[in-house]
C-alpha cells in the first residue's frame, strides 16, 4: 500500500511497510468541519524518490503551521443502510496527505531546545537515564551508584533487580520477618527486603517507559537537590535572623522561577493546545451509541467508525506537531503508525473522564461490552480509563502526553532517533513544569503520568490479538483502519 501525504504544494507519496495494530475507542461529543480525505492506496510514488526534506534544526527554525480542523463526520458503511448516505469520495485519496508547510507561516520563536548544541550523544535506555560523576553511593545497598534509575540514585545491580521484579510481578518472602538491613551482602540474600528498600527510596515502576526520563531531567533533579541541601546547610550555619530570611527568600524565588514556563515554552504549549482543541470527533457518532441500543454487529460498526475518526484526528494533530515534517518521511510514517493505538486510547480516556455527560460512562461501557469484543480486552481498557481519571489530568496534560506518545523515539523502524528525541524533549520539559504548577503538593505526579504511558504500551499487544480474532470472524474495516493497522 502507499500512504499519500500532501502539503500546500506538491503531494508526496510513501509506501507503508511497517506493521502496527489496534482499537480502543470512546466517542467525543463535539462537532467539527468535515474534511476531505484519508489514507488510501495509490498507484504512484516510489519509496526511493527525492523528498527534498530539510535537515533537522532546532525549534527556532521549525515552522508552526496554521491549524485547520479537518475531520470527516461521514460514514463508511453507508451501503449497509445503517448510516446516512455519504458521497463516494469520503475515503478518496488526498484526505490524509501530509505536506511540507511554508516557513513563512510558522512560529519563529525560540524554545529551550534551541539553546542546546546539536551534537551527537549516545542513546540511553530509560533505566540508565541520568549518569553521574563522583563516588555517589546506591541509596538501596550502598554500592557505587551509576546514575538515577527509576527516580532514585542506585547501582546497576539494584536497577536491574527492580526492573526484573516489576516486569515479572515478582513476590518474594523474607525469612527474617522483613527486618533485614540492606547492604551489599544482604541484597543477595533477601529479595523482599531489597525490593521494599527500592520502593522506600523512591524507585517508581511508572518510570519504566523508554526514553522519557532524560539526562536533562535528571540533571535538573540533582540541581534542585543540591540547591535544597545548600539552603539547609546555610540555614544551619547562620545565626542571623536577617540572613536566614534572605536565604529563605532567595530559595523560594529560585523554586518559583523553576516552576514557571518560559515565554517560549508558553508559546509552544499554546500552539499544541490550539492544534489539539481543533481536532474533535463528530457529535453524531457519540449520539449513535449513547442514545440507542443496537445489535452486536451494529455496535461493532459504530465502534469502527469511532476508531476511524480517532485515526483521522491523530493524523491531523500529528501533521501540526512542531518539527514533525522536518523528519525523514519514513520516520513520519513509523511514528504515526506506531502511536496510533496508544494515542487513540489516551484520547478515549480523556473523553471517558471529562467529556461524557453524567451517567453516560457506565452506559458506554455496557454498549461496548455488547459489541462482541472479549472481556479479556475490554476490562483492562476501562481499568486504564479509570486509572487515568484518578490522576485528575488537565487538558494541557492530555495534549502534551498525546504529543509525547507520538514523538516516541523508540518506535520500530525509526532511522533518526536522535532527531525524534530532540522534538520530544521540549514537550517533556513543559509537562514536568505543568505538573509542579498544577499539583505542587504531589511531587510524583509527573512520574505517574509517565506510568500511564507505560501502561498504554500493553494495549498494542491487546489490540493485535483483537485484530486477529476479528479477522477470523470476517469483520470488515474502513480503508483508513486497514492502512494504519496493516489489515490485509
From Swiss-Prot:
InterPro entries documented for this protein: NHR-like_dom_sf (IPR035500), NR_LBD_NR1H4 (IPR044114), Nucl_hrmn_rcpt_lig-bd (IPR000536), Nuclear_hormone_rcpt_NR1 (IPR050234), Nuclear_hrmn_rcpt (IPR001723), ThyrH_rcpt (IPR001728), Znf_hrmn_rcpt (IPR001628), Znf_NHR/GATA (IPR013088)
Subcellular location: Nucleus
Zinc finger motifs (NR C4-type), residue ranges: 138-158, 174-198
List of residues that carry N6-acetyllysine: 168, 228
Cross-link (Glycyl lysine isopeptide (Lys-Gly) (interchain with G-Cter in SUMO1)): 133, 291
NR LBD domain mapped to chain residues: 264-488
Keyword Cytoplasm attached: no
A Pfam match: zf-C4
Modification Phosphoserine, positions: 146, 165
Post-translational modification: Acetylated by EP300. Lys-228 as is the major acetylation site for EP300; the dynamicly regulated acetylation inhibits heterodimerization with RXRA and transactivation activity. Deacetylated by SIRT1. Elevated acetylation levels are found in metabolic disease states (mouse models of obesity and type II diabetes). Methylation may increase transactivation of target genes.
Chain positions recorded as chenodeoxycholate binding sites: 347, 377, 385, 463
Domain of life: Eukaryota
Residues modified to Phosphothreonine: 458
Keyword field contains Transcription regulation: yes
DNA-binding region(s) in UniProt: 135-210
UniProt note on tissues of expression: Expressed in liver and kidney. Expressed in pancreatic beta cells and macrophages. Expressed in the villus epithelium in adult ileum, with highest expression in the intervillus regions. Expression in colon is reduced by inflammation.
Phenotype reported upon loss of the gene: Elevated serum bile acid, cholesterol, and triglycerides, increased hepatic cholesterol and triglycerides, and a proatherogenic serum lipoprotein profile. Reduced bile acid pools and reduced fecal bile acid excretion.
Reported effect, residue 370 to N: Increases affinity to CDCA and transcriptional activity in response to CDCA
GO process annotations (BP): bile acid metabolic process; cell-cell junction assembly; cellular response to bile acid; cellular response to fatty acid; cellular response to lipopolysaccharide; cholesterol homeostasis; defense response to bacterium; fatty acid homeostasis
Family: Belongs to the nuclear hormone receptor family. NR1 subfamily.
Function text: Ligand-activated transcription factor. Receptor for bile acids (BAs) such as chenodeoxycholic acid (CDCA), lithocholic acid, deoxycholic acid (DCA) and allocholic acid (ACA). Plays a essential role in BA homeostasis through the regulation of genes involved in BA synthesis, conjugation and enterohepatic circulation. Also regulates lipid and glucose homeostasis and is involved in innate immune response.
Note: Mouse Nr1h4/FXR is less responsive to CDCA and more responsive to cholic acid (CA) than human FXR.
Self-association and partners: Heterodimer with RXRA; the heterodimerization enhances the binding affinity for LXXLL motifs from coactivators. Binds DNA predominantly as a heterodimer with RXRA. After activation by agonist binding interacts with coactivators. Interacts with PPARGC1A, SMARCA4 and EP300. Interacts with NCOA1, NCOA2, CARM1, SETD7, PRMT1, GPS2, SMARCA4 and MED1. Interacts with XRCC5 and XRCC6; decreasing NR1H4/FXR transactivation activity towards ABCB11/BSEP. Interacts with PAGR1 and NCOA6; indicative for an association with an MLL2/MLL3 complex (ASCOM). Interacts with NR5A2.
Disease: Activation protects mice against cholestasis, development of chronical intestinal inflammation and fibrosis. May suppress intestinal tumorigenesis.
Protein name: Bile acid receptor
Biological classification of the source: Eukaryota, Metazoa, Chordata, Craniata, Vertebrata
Amino acid at each position: 500500500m502507499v500512504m499519500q501525504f500532501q502539503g500546500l504544494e506538491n503531494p508526496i507519496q510513501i509506501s507503508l511497510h511497517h506493521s502496527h495494530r489496534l482499537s480502543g475507542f470512546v466517542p467525543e461529543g463535539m462537532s467539527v468541519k468535515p474534511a476531505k480525505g484519508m489514507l488510501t492506496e495509490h498507484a504512484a510514488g516510489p519509496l526511493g524518490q527525492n523528498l527534498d526534506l530539510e535537515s533537522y534544526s532546532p525549534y527556532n527554525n521549525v515552522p508552526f503551521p496554521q491549524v485547520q480542523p479537518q475531520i470527516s463526520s461521514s460514514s463508511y458503511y453507508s451501503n449497509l443502510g445503517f448510516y446516512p448516505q455519504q458521497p463516494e469520495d469520503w475515503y478518496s485519496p488526498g484526505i490524509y496527505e501530509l505536506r511540507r508547510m511554508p516557513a513563512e507561516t510558522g512560529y519563529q520563536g525560540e524554545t529551550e531546545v534551541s539553546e542546546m548544541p546539536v551534537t551527537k550523544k549516545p542513546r540511553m535506555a530509560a533505566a540508565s537515564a541520568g549518569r553521574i560523576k563522583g563516588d555517589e553511593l546506591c541509596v538501596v545497598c550502598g554500592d557505587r551508584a551509576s546514575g538515577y534509575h527509576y527516580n532514585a540514585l542506585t547501582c546497576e545491580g539494584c536497577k536491574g533487580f527492580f526492573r526484573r521484579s516489576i516486569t515479572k510481578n515478582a513476590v518474594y518472602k523474607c525469612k527474617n520477618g522483613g527486618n533485614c538491613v540492606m547492604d551489599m551482602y544482604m541484597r543477595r540474600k533477601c529479595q523482599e527486603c531489597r525490593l521494599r528498600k527500592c520502593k522506600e527510596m523512591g524507585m517508581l515502576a511508572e518510570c519504566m517507559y523508554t526514553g522519557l526520563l532524560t539526562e536533562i531531567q535528571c540533571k535538573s533533579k540533582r540541581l534542585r537537590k543540591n540547591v535544597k541541601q545548600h539552603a539547609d546547610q546555610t540555614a544551619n550555619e547562620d545565626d542571623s535572623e536577617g540572613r536566614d530570611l534572605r536565604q529563605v527568600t532567595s530559595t523560594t524565588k529560585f523554586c518559583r522561577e523553576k516552576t514557571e514556563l518560559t515565554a517560549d515554552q508558553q508559546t509552544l504549549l499554546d500552539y499544541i493546545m490550539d492544534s489539539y482543541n481543533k481536532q474533535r470527533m463528530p457529535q453524531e457518532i457519540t449520539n449513535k451509541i449513547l442514545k440507542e441500543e443496537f445489535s452486536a454487529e451494529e455496535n461493532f460498526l459504530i465502534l469502527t467508525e469511532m476508531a476511524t475518526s480517532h485515526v483521522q484526528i491523530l493524523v491531523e494533530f500529528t501533521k501540526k506537531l512542531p518539527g514533525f515534517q522536518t523528519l525523514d518521511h519514513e520516520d513520519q510514517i513509523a511514528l504515526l503508525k506506531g502511536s496510533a493505538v496508544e494515542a487513540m486510547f489516551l484520547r478515549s480516556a480523556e473523553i471517558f473522564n471529562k467529556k461524557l455527560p453524567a451517567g453516560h460512562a457506565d452506559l458506554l461501557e455496557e454498549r461496548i461490552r455488547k459489541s462482541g469484543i472479549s472481556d479479556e480486552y475490554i476490562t483492562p481498557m476501562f481499568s486504564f480509563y479509570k486509572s487515568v481519571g484518578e490522576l485528575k489530568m488537565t487538558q494541557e496534560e492530555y495534549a502534551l502526553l498525546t504529543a509525547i506518545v507520538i514523538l516516541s523515539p523508540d518506535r520500530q523502524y525509526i532511522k533518526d532517533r536522535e532527531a525524534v528525541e530532540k522534538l520530544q524533549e521540549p514537550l517533556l520539559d513543559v509537562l514536568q513544569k505543568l505538573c509542579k504548577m498544577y499539583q505542587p503538593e504531589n511531587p510524583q505526579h509527573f512520574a505517574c503520568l509517565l506510568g500511564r504511558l507505560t501502561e498504554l504500551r500493553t494495549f498494542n499487544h491487546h489490540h493485535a490479538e483483537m485484530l486477529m480474532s476479528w479477522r477470523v470472524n470476517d469483520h470488515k474495516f474502513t480503508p483508513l483502519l486497514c492502512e494504519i493497522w496493516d489489515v490485509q
